[in-house]
């Protein structure tokens, strides 16, 4: 029997597919739609210390090859999502979940994570170090010194399962430098990648979105090659205890298969989920299992990370 079951840290999942933060996760109702689908889990909207309305609209647009957005981290505040995942966990009848959070300063991040430490929530936390769409706030994980200092401080007080959402890296030396930092800490996972920041899409001589004069994060087909490169680069560099979540350009079982082949333990779907809805998880799971059967693979472990190189 072909299985797409997987594991992140000490958490087991009966499937390897889930939503990406930012899609179908703003409200409890949206999260429950993902919960009731064939997705293995859900990740919440990235929660900040306070409620945020986000950037002015229009701030999202579908494009021929994917999407562009400058949402600006709209969310209901981290406590809204923390309370929700905590309540679900207490029932004992739900899947393990991911709580996505970030502060707009190191102090805010510390306040949020200490509140999670003090809570009943024992699930996974995804710290978003890679949002490209908050005006005046750089993507933290591009600053290696700041990232190192932030993680060093976090792990002086935070002992629950924690992973980080990364921006895409484009230089081999940056993979080396980033991995050297991440390997110093007890991270449960890294998520590769967030959208490629500050793209520009034009139609009829005009930009598609309003914030930042049309500059926004690019998702969908555009970013799959970059996402696969990041997944594989970190798979080859990170210690085995740090699992990898692959995100970027996934809309078919073949896409998911390639992320796992590059080293991903789980795969998140963003743009295609926004376009197709939670039914996508059933379709992509079936397509992935079909590929596995054709190739004689019974489990993800049979091919994870087994990308072949040219002689």
From Swiss-Prot:
Annotated residues for binding of FMN: 45-46, 128, 165, 193, 220, 248-249, 270-271
Catalytic residue positions: 131
Pathway: Pyrimidine metabolism; UMP biosynthesis via de novo pathway
Enzyme class of the recorded protein, top EC level: oxidoreductase
Entries under InterPro entries matching the protein: Aldolase_TIM, DHO_dehydrogenase, DHOD_1A, Dihydroorotate_DH_1, Dihydroorotate_DH_1_2, Dihydroorotate_DH_cat, Dihydroorotate_DH_CS
SUPFAM superfamilies: FMN-linked oxidoreductases
Coiled coil: none
GO CC annotations, alphabetized: cytoplasm
Primary gene name: pyrD
Lineage per the UniProt record: Bacteria, Bacillati, Bacillota, Bacilli, Lactobacillales
Family to which the UniProt record says this protein belongs: Belongs to the dihydroorotate dehydrogenase family. Type 1 subfamily.
Name of this protein: Putative dihydroorotate dehydrogenase A (fumarate)
């Amino acid at each position: 029997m072909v299985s797409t079951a997987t594991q992140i840290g000490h958490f087991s999942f009966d499937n390897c597919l889930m939503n990406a933060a930012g899609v179908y996760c703003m409200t409890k109702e949206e999260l429950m739609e993902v919960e009731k689908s064939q997705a293995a889990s859900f990740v919440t909207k990235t929660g900040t210390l306070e409620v945020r309305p986000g950037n002015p609209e229009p701030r999202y647009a579908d494009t021929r090859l994917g999407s562009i957005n400058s949402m600006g981290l709209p969310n209901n505040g981290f406590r809204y999502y923390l309370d929700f995942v905590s309540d679900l966990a207490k029932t004992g009848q739900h899947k393990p979940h991911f709580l996505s959070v970030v502060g707009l300063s190191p102090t805010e991040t510390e306040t949020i994570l200490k509140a999670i430490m003090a809570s009943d929530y024992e699930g996974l936390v995804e710290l978003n170090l890679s949002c490209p769409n908050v005006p005046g706030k750089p993507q933290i994980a591009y600053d290696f010194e700041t990232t190192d200092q932030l993680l060093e401080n976090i792990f002086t007080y935070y002992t629950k399962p924690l992973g980080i959402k990364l921006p895409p890296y484009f230089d081999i030396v940056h993979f080396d430098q980033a991995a050297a930092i991440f390997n110093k800490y007890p991270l449960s996972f890294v998520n590769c990648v967030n959208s490629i920041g500050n793209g520009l899409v034009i139609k009829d001589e005009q930009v598609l979105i309003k914030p930042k004069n049309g500059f926004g994060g690019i998702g969908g087909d555009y970013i799959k090659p970059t996402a696969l490169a990041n997944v594989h680069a970190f798979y080859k560099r990170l210690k085995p205890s740090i699992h990898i979540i692959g995100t970027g350009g996934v809309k078919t079982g073949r896409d998911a298969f390639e992320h796992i082949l590059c080293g991903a333990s789980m795969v998140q779907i963003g743009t295609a989920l926004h376009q197709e809805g939670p039914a996508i998880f059933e379709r992509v799971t079936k397509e992935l299992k079909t590929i596995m059967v054709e190739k004689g693979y019974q489990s993800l472990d049979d091919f994870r990370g087994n990308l072949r190189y040219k002689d």
